Amino acid sequence: MIDLSQLSPMMQHYMETKKEYPDCVLFYRLGDFYEMFFDDALTVSKELEITLTGKDCGLSERAPMCGVPFHALDSYLYRLVQKGYKVAIAEQMEDPRQAKGLVKREVIRVVTPGTITSSQVLDETKNNYLMGIVYMDGIYGISTADISTGDFMVTEVDSDRELFDEINKFSPSEIICNNAFYMSGVDMDELKNRYQVVISALDSRFFGEESCRRILMEHFKVGALVGLGLEDYATGIIAAGAVMQYIYETQKSTLEHITTITPYSTGQYMVIDTSTRRNLELVETMREKQKRGTLLWVLDKTKTAMGARLLRACIEQPLIHRDEIIKRQNAVEELNMNYISREEICEYLNPIYDLERLIGRISYKTANPRDLIAFRSSLEMLPYIKRILGEFNSELLAELGREPDPLQDIFQLIGDAIVEEPPITVREGGIIKDGYNQEADKLRHAKTEGKNWLAELESKDKEKTGIKTLKVKFNKVFGYYFEVTNSFKDQVPDYYIRKQTLTNAERFTTDELKQLEDIIMGAEEKLVSLEYDLFCEVRDKIGAEVIRIQKTAKSIAGIDVFCSLSVVATRRNYVKPSINDKGVIQIKNGRHPVVEQMMRDDMFVANDTFLDNGKNRLSVITGPNMAGKSTYMRQVALIVLMAQLGSFVPAQEADIGICDRIFTRVGASDDLASGQSTFMVEMTEVANILRNATRNSLLVLDEIGRGTSTFDGLSIAWAVIEHISNSKLLGAKTLFATHYHELTELEGTIAGVKNYCIAVKEQGDDIVFLRKIVRGGADKSYGIQVAKLAGVPDSVIARAKEIAEELSDADITARAKEIAEISSNITQHKAVPKPDEVDLQQLSFFDTVKDDDIIRELDSLELSTMTPLDAMNTLYRLQTKLKNRWKETG
């Protein structure tokens, strides 16, 4: 325990400040460095790999110390915050040269992963979200804010899966929550590990209903929350209030740039769950977690950071209302038709800086003079963009053409006040233009004249002393001085007062030089102080126009997104899809947008698609692995998603029925973090799809049942097809790829099921994948041929052929045909039952063994109380028991 009374005054203040922020690393400003002491120094030196030293502190031993230069704060800060630390910044609040006694210092902000605002470390193409989650009475209130841009949203969901979908959509850097959230049953370890997010449960004072309502009403200056559209979000209000209070306390700012809060329902947009976002690789690839190879990579030709963020949001939240989709399409189409104007707009967009984050820094009072110059250079482009947009007639482009406020008053203010090439710091002068302020001009004149006086004094003393190398110089420690080289030091007059001795020279002052120094330094100090005040005044005037600036920034972002979609459409030969409410998806010569771009020209094989809610609602797609089934299915899902975000699509023609949700079950992978096997992950995702899909959903299911035995897998796949294709149970449009070619027997026996396969050309024992989807089912899997293509040794291939002949699956196929006939008879002579009346034995492979002890044990299992490991052990035991029985019966 440190005895504070023994510490020096500065170290006592450090420890008192640290006591106020015990959960933070304290960056304590000392001159040109931010220093850390004691335990913080040990932590930071280890985490950032910087040198650990010591400092006399009044104790018998030196205090451990490390530090970082003030001008490099952001990079060190970001690295520490990325490791999960909170950092409190204690700044000098007065000039140390003018301080009487201990320099006044105080914490000006606390930096956490979700409250970083520095443009030097944030990815300009992504939002940096802070998310607040409140769990109360079975409801999750969710509030999401990006304090660097001012975005602020709120919603509510009532299930863990919907919660995870929202977290996946926004990818927050930090989550704050109430203690009840930890008790809600959500797997916190999975949440932290899967999304790499810092989660903190805050004190209950953040979540008082009345205090949360009050802080929102006070911030947005309203008498009731009804005016903000929040009346239906009781739990969401608490989440939003907690987020606002947290930002107030960490940033110690009025948050003037957070001007609106947007309530939304998850039903306003197409629902894309976590698995689908991952499988379709919308904004990052599954393996490398990078942008290249994603839909965002294909569509992003934006010129501004604001546009890049908005495009990402559009991909994450496709529309479900036909009129809104068509408005976006018309904007893209008009830009396509006016190629020259579009290219001109893109040229003017290119120099525009990130206005949203600039106004955020201006509101936080952290913007420097160069930020204002960047702001002005951006505003210079607005009149040109506005003029060109005046030529367009489509509703959204015409609206965007009216909205951008050129902000000429701000443009003029910055031009009048700030020099063209200012310094990056605000307290060293050189910021304000001549003519902007009379007092500054006077001080600047005195400073300039002082320089002339110094030049005259130098010339006069050179002549008077005969010292040819005599120079008047300056540094911050000694001020102004005469410097004389050693070869002339014998000629220095007696009235010269020595100030410093160097290796090759000596430094002196005189009474006359001291007088000039007082005049010049006085003028310089006053000028630096005045320029700082004037700069802050200009910055505050700009900050007062935050609403105008944000509206303009959002308009520019919208224009940028439409131009980006138009550029991609024309370069990649995309077409404008028709949008219908009839549930029909018809695509002629559709192409996968990402795969096409990564292949050489004309190498991609286009394919047709037809799905509806009637006779063509489920396509069973068979064919060998590597033939292109997964690519084709993802292609259809991406084309639908692109159409609903308002983009043109890679096809010759397309008519897209609006889908409320897209679900995918593609690929196989163990979820080791949560102890789930490949098969358990697969079945969990299938269960989610069957429970949450609707008639208007699009389902993409790849190789259902592959993670278990052939009989079980085929049984499950068969039953899933029956359930989905039954219009009274679900009836969703579905692409169902499978290696169970026995499932092709379902066409003609189950309404709405159609067979398709990947065309294959056989050349002796070899095969060629034609990548073409054709009607009909594959009668074999070509697994051995695929193994040969993959380079499996010839000896293994030969042995596989021998075994395949011995293990002919004709019996399975024959049994499948029998079941298909039973199914056909049942559907012809029996009304389709309600879900709770479905006969569990219908179409069972084991329909003759209802009294079997294995069946009875399966029926008695309490699945809801079993862990994944228990379930797998039970399945293994029952499977072993069944295999032993088969051996006994021959």
Describe each PLM feature range.
Residues 844-890:
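C-terminal tails and terminal domains of large nucleic-acid-associated
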Residues 207-213, 222, 270-274, 282, ...:
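Amphipathic heptad-repeat alpha-helical coiled-coil/stalk segments that mediate oligomerization
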Residues 167, 172-180, 186-189, 201, ...:
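Conserved catalytic alpha/beta cores of large enzymes that bind or transform nucleotide phosphates
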Residues 1-334, 350-363, 367-459, 827-836:
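Charged catalytic and DNA/RNA-contacting regions of genome-maintenance
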Residues 38-41, 233, 303-304, 314, ...:
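ATPase nucleotide-binding head domains, primarily ABC-like/P-loop NTPase cores
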Residues 325, 332, 342-348, 375, ...:
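Amphipathic alpha-helical coiled-coil segments
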Residues 354, 364, 368, 378-381, ...:
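Charged, surface-exposed helical/loop "interaction arms" that form contiguous linear patches used
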Residues 90, 113-122, 254, 392-396, ...:
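Active-site phosphate-binding and catalytic loops of NTP-dependent enzymes
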